[in-house]
């Protein structure tokens, strides 16, 4: 569990904010009626606000530890998990339906006419990609030593205003869900 070790690097404020958010999410699971939830959320916020200006870090750390223990004992046994979140029922469900970018090249002109702004911008990206391809490959060949490591990250742009090599897959994404 690598995410647990990152807690040592969080500031006190970040730990308090994360505890507050977790407490609100679990409170949402306990109180299904919105008005009741809002009332208890205001009470919870008031409890956190009581000690928000605490200057003594020893006391603040002790308060945080006590609050985390209270949260642990009062958490919901089956908290609500959003469907698209990790652990949710629909998490990564539509991965197999994502359409690759090259499939848009095969659209009929009448289909492309329905989204003129998108396809105009896409054509600009494709033109820029064609123009920069040779220069980017040349830059990579010059900067990569023969027999050198092939798993390192790509080098950054060397000139002001230039893009790093092979950049377009970062700035252009395929449609995430089919229509």
From Swiss-Prot:
It comes from the Eukaryota. Its main location: mitochondrion. It is found in: Mitochondrion inner membrane. Keywords: Acetylation, Electron transport, Membrane, Mitochondrion, Mitochondrion inner membrane, Phosphoprotein, Respiratory chain, Transport. It is a peripheral membrane protein. Residues 139-160 are annotated as: Disordered. The modification N-acetylalanine is found at residue 2. The modification Phosphoserine is found at residue 85. GO terms for cellular component: mitochondrial inner membrane; mitochondrion; respiratory chain complex I. GO terms for biological process: mitochondrial electron transport, NADH to ubiquinone. InterPro entries: Complex1_LYR_dom, Complex1_LYR_NDUFB9_LYRM3, NDUFB9. Mammalian complex I is composed of 45 different subunits. Accessory subunit of the mitochondrial membrane respiratory chain NADH dehydrogenase (Complex I), that is believed to be not involved in catalysis. Complex I functions in the transfer of electrons from NADH to the respiratory chain. The immediate electron acceptor for the enzyme is believed to be ubiquinone. Belongs to the complex I LYR family. This is NADH dehydrogenase [ubiquinone] 1 beta subcomplex subunit 9. It comes from Bos taurus (Bovine). The gene is NDUFB9.
